[in-house]
Regions:
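Immediate post-signal peptide segment of exported/extracytoplasmic ligand-binding proteins
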Residues: 24-34, 55, 137-143, 288-290, ...
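Short, well-ordered beta-strand elements
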Residues: 27-42, 59-64, 143-147, 248
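Pocket-flanking alpha-helical
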Residues: 47, 64-102, 182-186, 205-212
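Ligand-binding cleft/hinge of the Venus flytrap
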Residues: 50-57, 139-173, 281
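Ligand-binding pocket segment of bilobal, Venus flytrap-like solute-binding proteins
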Residues: 80-84, 154-221
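A conserved helix-loop-strand patch within extracytoplasmic ligand-binding domains
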Residues: 102-152
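A bilobed periplasmic-binding-protein/Venus flytrap-type ligand-binding module shared by bacterial periplasmic
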Residues: 115-126, 227-240, 263-264
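C-terminal functional modules
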Residues: 255-310
Length: 310
C-alpha cells in the first residue's frame, strides 16, 4: 500500500506540474467533458460554474447524476472525466479504495473550511442535544431515526457503522436514506411542528440559512472537524486533455460563492446554469484567475471568449 501511495502521489504531482505550465489546445477527443453530480446542491452549483466556462471555451460539458460509488467506479473505468465533489474526510473510504491505489487522481483542492456532520434544529439543541452522546437520551422524541442522504453516500456509510457498532448507544436506531431534497422536506416538516429531528447537515448549503440549525459535536472520529473538497479526475486525464486539465487545476471556489449561487436557485427559482451565469457576470474578475494559462478548444484566448459568451 505504501508503494502505491507513493506512485499515486508522484503521478498526481506530475500532472499538476503539467497543469501549471501554459496550456495547449486540446484534441477534439477532449471536446466533451464528462462530469458527475451525486444530486447535491453544492456540486450542482460548482458543476454549473464549470459548465458555463467550458461552454464559453467551446467544450461540451456532459453531466450525469450518479450515486457516489458509481462516480468512483466511473472515474476508474474512464466513463467519468471529472468529479468536483470529493468531500474529505467524509469520503476517506473511497479515497483509500480508489485514489490511494492510483486508479483515480485527486487532482486539486477546490474548497476549504467545510463542515459535514449531524445537525439538529436550534430548539432541539437548546433542549440539551448538543453532542452525539446526547441523542439516545432523547431517543423517544427522535423516534430513534437519523435522516441521511442517498444510499451509498459516504456519510451514510459512517452513520451505518456508528449504528452497527452501537456507538453513543445508537445501536437500535434507524438510518433513513433518501435524496437530499427528501431529507430536507422531512426536516422542514418536523421544524414546523417543533418536533425533534436529527439529520445530516453541511456547509456550504442553503439549509444553513433556511433552517435555524446547530451542528453536533462528538462525531469527529467519523466526520472529522472542518474539511476540504477536492477535484478528482480519471487517471491520465490531465495528460490527454492538458487545456481542460489546467482549467480544473485553477477552479477554486469559496463558501460565499457557492452559497450565493445556491441561494439564487432556491430563492429566485433559477436553474443552476442561470444562477452560475449571473454570478460570473457580476464577478468577472474570477474568470481571470480560472482562465490563467487556459485556451479555447481551438487554441484562442479563453478569457475573451468566455466574457463574450456571457
Amino acid at each position: 500500500m505504501k508503494v502505491t501511495m507513493k506512485i499515486s502521489t508522484a503521478l498526481a504531482a506530475g500532472w499538476l506540474a503539467l497543469a501549471g505550465t501554459a496550456a495547449v489546445a486540446d484534441e477534439q477527443s477532449c471536446a466533451t467533458v464528462k462530469m458527475a453530480d451525486p444530486g447535491w446542491s453544492d456540486i450542482a452549483a460548482t458543476n454549473a460554474l464549470a459548465s458555463v466556462v467550458l461552454e464559453g471555451m467551446g467544450y461540451r460539458p456532459k453531466i450525469d447524476t450518479l450515486a457516489v460509488p458509481i462516480i468512483y467506479g466511473g472515474l476508474k473505468d474512464g466513463q467519468v472525466d471529472v468529479f468536483l465533489g470529493n468531500w474529505m474526510p467524509a469520503q476517506q473510504g473511497f479515497h483509500d479504495k480508489f485514489v490511494a491505489t492510483g486508479d483515480v487522481v485527486q487532482y486539486a483542492k477546490n474548497l476549504d473550511g467545510t463542515e459535514f456532520t449531524l445537525a439538529v434544529p436550534d430548539y432541539v439543541y437548546d433542549a440539551g442535544v448538543k453532542d452525539f452522546a446526547d441523542l439516545d437520551k432523547h431517543a423517544d422524541k427522535f423516534g430513534k431515526k437519523i435522516y441521511g442522504i442517498g444510499s451509498g453516500a459516504p456519510a451514510n456509510l459512517s452513520l451505518a457503522e456508528i449504528i452497527k457498532k452501537d456507538e453513543f448507544g445508537l445501536g437500535d436506531w434507524k438510518l433513513v436514506e433518501s435524496s437530499e431534497q427528501a431529507m430536507l422536506t422531512e426536516v422542514n416538516r418536523n421544524v414546523k411542528k417543533k418536533s425533534f429531528v436529527v439529520f445530516l447537515g453541511w456547509t456550504p448549503h442553503p439549509m444553513n440559512v433556511q433552517i435555524k440549525l446547530k451542528y453536533l459535536t462528538g462525531g469527529e472520529k467519523y466526520f472529522g472537524s472542518t474539511g476540504t473538497v477536492h477535484t478528482l479526475t480519471r487517471k491520465g486525464y490531465a495528460e490527454s486533455c492538458p487545456n481542460t486539465g489546467k482549467l480544473f487545476s485553477n477552479l477554486v471556489f469559496t463558501q460565499e460563492m457557492e452559497n450565493g449561487i445556491m441561494a439564487d436557485v432556491a430563492n429566485n427559482k433559477k436553474t443552476n446554469a442561470q444562477a452560475a451565469q449571473a454570478w460570473l457576470k457580476a464577478n468577472p474578475q474570477q474568470l481571470e484567475k480560472w482562465l490563467d494559462g487556459v485556451k479555447t478548444l481551438d487554441g484562442k484566448d479563453a478569457l475573451a471568449a468566455v466574457k463574450a459568451k456571457l
